[in-house]
From Swiss-Prot:
Cellular component aspect of the GO annotation: cytoplasm; exosome (RNase complex)
Keywords associated with the record: Cytoplasm, Exosome, RNA-binding
Biological source species: Pyrococcus abyssi (strain GE5 / Orsay)
InterPro entries in the record: Exosome_RNA_bind1/RRP40/RRP4, KH_dom, KH_dom_type_1, KH_dom_type_1_sf, NA-bd_OB-fold, Rrp4, RRP4_N, RRP4_S1
Domain spans labelled S1 motif: 65-137
Protein name: Exosome complex component Rrp4
Lineage: Archaea, Methanobacteriati, Methanobacteriota, Thermococci, Thermococcales
Length: 265
């Protein structure tokens, strides 16, 4: 019998029966016969026939296909070492950065990405010994480097809450604060604003979501916070007008009711 016993984004504890049948068990789960159970306290993530549980706490555990924000921490002969907040560093090989033929004997890879640069990449592969391979091919801005702005780090399991249903939450923050924001599924978020005040406001909203992610009425509270702060900035002459939302974001009263994905700016 093929059956799923939980809802997507449902909070579960170790030992919770998740599914039965020919499903693939991902991270945070184990299989016993035909049944799949949770091994951690976290949120259920169902994609196609794969079921995994994203831990509420702890380091980011990458999955193939995740879009992540990373920081270059070392430059080697034919690759870069990238910190993505996982237990192990990731690798970006030159062939996963460009199709252009590069003469490695005559080319210093620092001309593309240097130590300290922030990039936007996709998890391409993970080996059995936890080697993590990234690719920037096909990514917005060709993967970077992302200039200026700040990196905000939140709990990875709360990324869908920051994004909201259909991108409603993150789009509201970007619209009202007039900032560029890229959310990585590793919980690293790049925020770049027109000025320091708006950038700090966007970060304040993101950190509030991280702190209150499992509470009801969060969308309305974030909107109220943004509008209140923007009114203060207008009165101080920092901004001329408060941006208007084209559509009112739908409330997200369900504590676990999120299906957002971490996508580009």
């Amino acid at each position: 019998m093929k059956r799923i016993f939980v809802q997507n984004r449902e909070l579960v504890v170790p030992g919770t029966l998740l599914a039965q049948g020919p499903y693939k068990n991902g991270r945070g789960t184990f299989r016993e016969g035909s049944r799949i159970y949770s091994t951690v306290i976290g949120l259920v993530d169902i994609k196609g026939n794969t079921i995994r549980v994203i831990p509420l706490e702890g380091p980011y555990i990458p999955e193939v296909g995740d879009n992540v924000i990373g920081k270059i921490v070392d430059v080697k002969f034919s690759s870069w070492v990238v910190d993505i907040g996982a237990p192990y560093p990731a690798n970006l090989k030159i062939q996963d950065f460009t199709d252009e033929k590069i003469d490695l004997l005559r080319t210093d890879l620092r001309k593309f990405f240097d130590i300290g640069d922030i990039i936007y990449a996709k998890v391409k592969a993970i080996t059995e010994v936890n080697n993590i391979d990234l690719t920037t091919k096909g990514m917005p801005f060709n993967g970077g480097p992302l200039k200026g702005g700040q990196i905000v780090k939140i709990t990875p399991s709360r990324v869908p809450r920051v994004i909201g249903r259909g991108g409603s939450m993150i789009n509201m923050i970007k619209k009202l604060t007039m900032t560029r924001i890229i959310v990585g599924q590793n919980g690293w978020i790049w925020v770049s604003g027109k000025n320091d005040a708006l950038e700090k406001l966007a970060i304040e909203a993101i950190l509030k979501i991280d702190k209150e992610s499992h509470t009801r009425g969060l969308t309305d509270r974030i909107k109220a916070l943004l509008l209140s702060r923007l009114q203060e900035l207008k009165e101080k002459g920092v901004i001329e007008e408060i941006p208007k939302l084209e559509e009112e974001p739908q409330g997200e009263d369900e504590v676990n009711g999120n299906d957002g994905e971490a996508r580009g700016a």
